[in-house]
Amino acid sequence: MRYISLLGATGSIGEQTLDVIRQHPDKFKLKAMTFGRNVDKAIPIIEQFQPEFVGCLSEEAYHTLKGHSFEYDVKMAAGDEANIEAAIYDAVDVVVNALVGSVGLVPTLKAIEQKKTIALANKETLVTAGHIVKEYAKTYDVPLLPVDSEHSAIFQCLQGEQAKNIERLIVTASGGSFRDKKRTELEGVTVEEALNHPNWSMGAKITIDSATMMNKGLEVIEAHWLFDIPYEQIDVLLHKESIIHSMVEFHDKSVMAQLGTPDMRVPIQYALTYPDRAPLPEAKSLNLWEIGQLNFQKADFDRYRCLHFAYESGKIGGTMPAVLNAANEMAVDAFLKGKVTFLQIEELIEKALNRHHVISTPSLQDIHEVDKETRDFVQSILT
């Protein structure tokens, strides 16, 4: 039995993680969970899974929870510290970090200090502070197990292989909601159109990131840290069907690929059961004859400028990826609220990157300060 702490239980990854836990009551038990402010979603989860600890970001949600009559005694906390409390909860073996945004960084570090196995779905943890997280993981001898389908695919392809034999990583990308549109057609696109992803069921922020290809850019930075591979050896390949989740090419030009129908529960479950596997009854088998053909296209950095920003930020390193991430979070939020157009997301990010003076080897405090400065700068443009 593995005891789970789930950070971000009411989000897309959180809900699919709960589905995996639900299908394997003999293997997993939810001991702790956190959520933001969606108390209507949280209460049924608490009642079904009966975690010992529940944390929420919103004080209002916390008071609603406190006023609810549960059939058992549950510990509760509110605010930013709640994620940390859940991450270091004593009875937990595995922490699933399904938080969205840079808020996921500190809970990850605290969980590593307590030698919890990390199942990482929060890209921003490695994007903003990859050098610190990797050093923590090495110091405390804690595995970082990827939950993203692309990184899980690479992780699976590398089982039994030696890192020294890797030629390059090939990270696949669906192309997002606007993959069939020319760049000139993007100016007037709506939020509703952007949120209509052709392949995956995801949260709003990551769906917009997929449309701009920033999501893939963040995944490139994440892959750099997870697998210790230079950016020059990480390629992005457009693949509309999302059947090949990623590939690894070795020095002898052999290529290993991991395939499957688009279902986030598969990589989530693999992270929870690793190094074993378990049946996933509701997952669909891959019948290639039904698909007929798979399509591929080279990523166009002029078409997807956010992908270019991510590669350049990663190569520069230091605090630049933290700026990239903070500016993107602010810009995407502004787009979702109707304050900027789709293409203005790129413009805001570029302005933030161009004004930043990089700190080469930042401390955690430096990263926090740069994050806040960047958000304040973008906000000053928006107001």
From Swiss-Prot:
It comes from the Bacteria. Pathway: Isoprenoid biosynthesis; isopentenyl diphosphate biosynthesis via DXP pathway; isopentenyl diphosphate from 1-deoxy-D-xylulose 5-phosphate: step 1/6. Catalyzes the NADPH-dependent rearrangement and reduction of 1-deoxy-D-xylulose-5-phosphate (DXP) to 2-C-methyl-D-erythritol 4-phosphate (MEP). InterPro entries: DXP_reductoisomerase (IPR003821), DXP_reductoisomerase_C (IPR013644), DXP_reductoisomerase_N (IPR013512), DXPR_C (IPR026877), DXPR_C_sf (IPR036169), NAD(P)-bd_dom_sf (IPR036291). Mn(2+) binds at residues 148, 150, 219. Its EC number is 1.1.1.267. Its cofactor is Mg(2+); Mn(2+). Pfam families: DXP_redisom_C (PF08436), DXP_reductoisom (PF02670), DXPR_C (PF13288). This is 1-deoxy-D-xylulose 5-phosphate reductoisomerase. Keywords: Isoprene biosynthesis, Manganese, Metal-binding, NADP, Oxidoreductase. It catalyses: 2-C-methyl-D-erythritol 4-phosphate + NADP(+) = 1-deoxy-D-xylulose 5-phosphate + NADPH + H(+). The keyword Transit peptide does not apply. 1-deoxy-D-xylulose 5-phosphate binds at residues 123, 149-150, 174, 197, 210, 215-216, 219. Belongs to the DXR family. GO terms for molecular function: 1-deoxy-D-xylulose-5-phosphate reductoisomerase activity; manganese ion binding; NADPH binding. GO terms for biological process: isopentenyl diphosphate biosynthetic process, methylerythritol 4-phosphate pathway involved in terpenoid biosynthetic process. It is an enzyme of class 1 (oxidoreductase). NADPH binds at residues 10-13, 36-38, 122, 124, 203.
